[in-house]
């Protein structure tokens, strides 16, 4: 479920940063009869269709990261695309000058859950590939990891409906890849439009690590799209918030717009 689709410009407060955001945009609604019982797998497949409806998009987002009064601001350009079993993302800092040109790109093969990621530091003048656990480290000091920035695909996990109320389905998802950094994820999926409203991430010890709350949505071409979200580190109390100010969808993008060459 991508928190981010398309090109995104982010203005960030207190970031050592999305993403997720980017990734984080919400998408197409599938109508389901209230009387029809659905499994956890079906609910998450429908949520995946909503949160990943648009194959690409362009947005501007204000992003704030930090704790208390210690906050910084960043302008970040995000480009994402999905289709044919692949998800691609590129993120480049534009402001302030101290981080201008710093970039990150990642590509995920959904079927194999294989990911390649790279970072570009202008001060070094070269692209560096992120290996193994480096992809799960903090995205430039934010409360998102590099892998969080793109978001997850429903096919990466198994899903169980563990409860519901008048407003939400409660889903527990377990990664299929035993090497995944998370042991499980708890979702709240809105019954009204199949959007994901909350995700709690658990570490390998089963401890709640952080929580993503998707606060506001708006309709774009009749589809609910994320406006505001907050990622909270439940250990440190640090918070990263993302507030979108504009967006374009269905932007034509190509493979050469992503990857290590596109970062330079």
Predicted regions and their residues:
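Short, ordered beta-strand-loop transition motifs
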Residues: 81-87, 161-170, 220-221
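A short, amphipathic edge element
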Residues: 41, 72-73, 149-160, 206-211
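N-terminal mature ectodomain segment of secretory-pathway/periplasmic proteins
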Residues: 39-122
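Short, solvent-exposed mixed-charge patches
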Residues: 263-264
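N-terminal secretory signal peptides that target proteins for export/translocation
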Residues: 1-15
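Sec/Tat signal peptide C-region and signal peptidase I cleavage site
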Residues: 32-37
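Gly/Pro-enriched, hydrophobic low-complexity segments
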Residues: 94, 105, 116-120, 126-131, ...
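Bacterial N-terminal signal peptides
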Residues: 18-31
């Amino acid at each position: 479920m991508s928190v981010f689709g398309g090109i995104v410009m982010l203005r960030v407060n207190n970031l050592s940063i999305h993403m997720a955001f980017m990734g984080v945009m919400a998408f197409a609604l599938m109508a389901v009869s209230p009387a029809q019982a659905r499994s956890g797998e079906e609910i998450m497949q429908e949520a995946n269709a909503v949160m990943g409806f648009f194959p690409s998009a362009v947005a501007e987002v204000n992003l704030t990261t930090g704790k208390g009064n210690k906050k910084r601001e960043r302008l970040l350009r995000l480009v994402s695309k999905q289709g044919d079993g692949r998800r691609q993302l590129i993120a480049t800092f534009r402001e302030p000058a101290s981080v201008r040109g710093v970039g990150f790109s990642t590509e995920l093969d959904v079927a194999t859950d294989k990911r390649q990621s790279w970072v570009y530091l202008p001060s070094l003048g070269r692209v560096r590939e992120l290996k193994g656990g480096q992809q799960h480290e903090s995205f430039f000091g934010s409360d998102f990891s590099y892998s969080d920035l793109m978001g997850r695909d429903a096919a990466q996990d198994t899903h169980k409906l563990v409860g519901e109320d008048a407003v939400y389905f409660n889903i527990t998802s377990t990664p299929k890849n035993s090497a995944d950094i998370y042991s499980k994820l708890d979702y709240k999926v809105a019954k009204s439009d199949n959007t994901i409203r909350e995700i709690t991430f658990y570490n390998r010890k089963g401890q709640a690590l952080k929580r993503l709350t998707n606060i506001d949505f708006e309709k774009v071409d009749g589809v609910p799209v994320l406006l505001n979200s907050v990622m909270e580190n439940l250990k440190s109390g640090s918070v990263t918030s993302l507030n979108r100010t504009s967006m374009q969808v269905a932007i034509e993008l190509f493979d050469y717009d992503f990857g290590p060459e596109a970062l330079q």
